[in-house]
Amino acid sequence: ADSFAWLRLPSAAKPALPSLFLVGDSTVRTGRGDGGGGQWGWGEYLPNYFDLARINVVNRAVGGTGVRTFLDTGYWAAITAKLKPGDFVMIQFGHNDNGARAPLKGIGDEREERVNPATKASGPMHTWGWYLRQYIREARAKGATPIICSLIPRKIWKDGKIARTADSHADWARAIAQAEGVAFVDLHELIARRYDEIGPEKVNAFFADERVHTSAAGAEFNAASVVAGLQVLAKNPL
């Protein structure tokens, strides 16, 4: 990740108003958020559904980051420095939480000493859920309201339906949200179900690459799904 990318990330247009900060990877904000390569994240279209005279929508997601690396690279600290009581933080991770840089699997309190492949330094590695809890607790400590989203699905078809990732990031996100008592939007299942209904031909137009990054139409579709997911919550914080 570009260690100076956060300097170019947006700030609240009207600092006196409450702000909704978006935290995540390139499926939320791709590159500079300008449609480079035809790719757009859903966070670029979410402001269309809010009254921007009453709330800021600030897309601070960074491509290539995961639940641990967004913390370790200082992107989260740059947000908490701006958080104030009455703000909201919407968090979606999982697409970059595999391989050598992945946290430990699960949501428990296990930890291991690991060598960071980027820095070569040794340090403790926690579970995926442990890291997600840090966002929730630090947001609350600032008087902000966290909202957890499961990761949007990849375009992988299996037996005519979008493949779900069982016992993985989507389920862990739900479990942590329930344990911490925060709002949860199951984007993984909600969008997958909508893709199933629409079918492969139309869904193909929603993607700018083979299976992960969305086109403008796909990002707009996913932003609408975020809003739909919020609207059906028993206690919608927004």
Stretch-by-stretch model annotation:
Residues 32-36, 69-71, 159-164:
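Short, solvent-exposed loop/turn segments at secondary-structure boundaries
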Residues 30, 66, 155-156:
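Flexible loop/turn segments at secondary-structure boundaries
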Residues 75-216, 220, 224-236:
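Alpha-helical cap/lid subdomain in secreted, periplasmic
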Residues 28, 70, 206-207:
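Short clusters of hydrophobic/aromatic residues that line enzyme substrate/ligand-binding pockets
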Residues 26, 65-66, 96:
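Gly/Ser/Thr-rich beta-alpha loop segments that engage phosphate groups in nucleotides
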Residues 1-61, 77-89, 105-109:
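Serine-esterase "nucleophile elbow" of acetyl-processing enzymes
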Residues 2-11, 226, 230, 236-238:
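A recurrent domain-boundary module in secreted/ectodomain proteins
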Residues 59-72:
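Functional beta-strand-loop-alpha-helix junction segments that form "active/interaction loops"
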